[in-house]
Amino acid sequence: MSEKMLKFVDIGQQNPPKRDISERKEDFDEIYQEFLKDRAVQQSSRCSQCGVPFCQVHCPLSNNIPDWLKLTAEGRYEEAYQLSQSTNNMPEVCGRICPQDRLCEGNCVIEQSGHGTVTIGSIEKYITEKAWENGWVKPIEINSEKNESVGIIGSGPAGLACGEQLRKKGYKVTIYDRYDRAGGLLIYGIPGFKLEKHVVQRRIKLLEESGIKFVLNFEVGKDSSLTELREKHDAILIATGVYKAREVNLPGNDLSNIFPAMEFLTASNKKGLGDKVELFDNGTLNAEGKDVVVIGGGDTAMDCLRTSVRQNAKSVKCLYRRDRENMPGSAREVGNAEEEGVEFIWLTSPKEFKGTNKIESVVVNKMKLGEPDDSGRRKPVIEENSDFEIKADLVIKALGFDPEDLPKLFNEEKLQVSRWGTIKADFDTMETSIEGVFAAGDIVRGASLVVWGIKDGRDAATSIDNYLQSKQKLRVA
């Protein structure tokens, strides 16, 4: 055991400093500053090097966290990075946006003993940024190019991870995306104050330099059928994610200035990338000077709230039907939102949208927590005669996402889906009801975390490789 480790008794937990609230509210830059070199080494040395590393157990990617913490504590940064990236295609992304408090850090043994968790995410970000700065992150070098090609539909975390893994094996990889930029949720869904866009674009450029081809503004079902795409490639992966907004069907739902979360966030991100966004420029999808109400309690709701603050909203309120302890969003993000001036109105649910042509107010019911539902969470129940009214010029619905009707969009009735609309894929092989067509990420498991998308993409690459290798053996035989 290195003498540099197990310092958690002597060294307290310390996170990277946040930028001043008054400063960070004025822009979309990331709010967390990076560790200084000595601080990263010091915080890494707090790891207790557990015999059973629960941080690794609770990471979807099973990242070798204790090992790269030890290497960081010893100042062996390049080795730490190489170990980190061996199991994770985007450590610079996960270090920034993973809900570590629910995964690795939340299960850190020294956290359970009252010493404060090792700051795993911040250290992961530190060693990865150091790798980019020092040129340790390099394009993929192919020793032997294979003849087979794979088409990937969707350039989000699952599609990018799968494409990279297949390219490493020598396959020709083409990634198709309906949008004008690659990155999916990473580029248009997550605000810059959590994930600056140059971080995503840097990774995309690296994949292009590795020989992966990106075809943008391409819609399966319009520009090509799934059948035609399947004939063009030796295998296909569907990794479209889930983008259909869940609705709240209430009186007044047809009033103007009520928008789904992704429409609001996409407009903001496009504007930040320098695009001309008419609905933003004319004030429609812009929170400036408005009383904003966001409905929902997940991380997307937090993104909408904090984006509204940065657009200089007059007021920003969040309606959530349960209490703080039962909120699905990251506790860290809730705290950041409160620091920036967001008002959370717990145990409330919208009853009616009111206004003449456009939204003017939201009628809200007070809620109380009843008996647990099937998920084990206490079910919110309306308190009788408890409704009250909140002024609103802009309402954003952040109630989660469902799959689009892909068989209809892709014009492919053979593509089987579950009763929830997610694609049916074999649990082991990830192959769909169509031979040679695989699926991964949120379109299979439902809306989830970026880290799970990366995990699914890596697994899909293994399955596709096995499929193509078995086809090759049959041809040889």
Language model: regions and residue ranges:
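Immediate flanking context of iron-sulfur cluster ligation sites
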Residues: 34-54, 78-103
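Extended, hydrophobic alpha-helical segments in both membrane/secreted and soluble proteins
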Residues: 55, 59, 157-162, 292-294, ...
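FAD-binding core/adjacent interface of flavoenzyme oxidoreductases
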Residues: 68, 93-96, 101-153, 169, ...
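FAD-site-proximal beta/loop scaffold in flavoenzymes
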Residues: 254-289, 373-447
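Predominantly flavin-linked oxidoreductase catalytic cores and closely associated redox partners
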Residues: 278, 282-316
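A conserved FAD-binding loop/helix module that cradles the flavin
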Residues: 304, 443-468
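A structured beta-alpha segment of the ubiquitous adenosine-cofactor-binding alpha/beta core
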Residues: 36, 209-230, 276-284, 347-393
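Beta1-alpha1 glycine-rich phosphate/pyrophosphate-binding loop at the start
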Residues: 3-33, 62-74, 83-85, 112-121, ...
